[in-house]
């Protein structure tokens, strides 16, 4: 299985914990800040995890490249942008039949409503919303799961 932690991997979540738990996956981490990529390379070396591709760049650039476009089983993202924009950055990486999984906050239902046109254009269907309750926190976290059902038009991401 090939997973891309596509947009703003930051400190490596959820990519690095997934790779630690699931040793058989291939993982690609993409971030626009080289210092984050350098940090993640050092962390993975110290922890002893391999089979990770680190990319310094932007999703909107790499999502257009044939070697990355529609090649991944799963793309993940944290809540770094509104859902329609996040989908535009991530969905082009996912192969048909694969999944886009993202973390969203308390406005997840509203963002889903605002994303219906983007879902249709980008070729994904909404599958599930998983509510996450964290101990000692009153914050509302949601994991949204989408399945890619058709190829994304070449003009995306813009």
Where would I find each of the regions flagged by the language model?
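S-adenosyl-L-methionine
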Residues: 30, 37-70
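Conserved beta-strand signature within the Rossmann-like core of class I S-adenosyl-L-methionine
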Residues: 97-107
